[in-house]
Amino acid sequence: MGEMQVPADRYWAAQTQRSYQNFKIGIEKMPTEIVHAFGILKKGAAIANFNLGKLDEERKNVICQAADDVISGKLMDHFPLAVWQTGSGTQSNMNSNEVIANRGNEIAGKKILHPNDHINMSQSSNDTFPTALHIAAAMSIEDNLFPAMDKLTETLKAS
């Protein structure tokens, strides 16, 4: 597909850069909650792949560390894509794979992770994007709806 120039200070790679350059639609970026959910998903997949004997322990540990950086929000600047993209979320899945692979390689001090071979192992964009949406929805319910319902209940009881 040709060479792509990616800013040196970014963890994303060619697939994300192509999407960023070719699909500048609107100003809305992928919601933080979805990005964090992708981190949770990729961490869980690494643990599952390790438990299945498909991924060695060093790679699993490095993927988990890099995914934790995504989950914590430290790497939000490395997720530049618009929310408006294909229905399967392929661009966001690849953005997550590339960021976690490149951050993981930095953590490891050597190139041991590949976005497709290790971060996306046993996964498909058709599955990861809806799964990330479900994770984000569940977290929002837990973090926002339940506390609001508790507050409403207490307010009504006090009335």
Outline where the language-model segments fall:
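Conserved, well-structured ligand/cofactor-binding cores
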Residues: 1-159
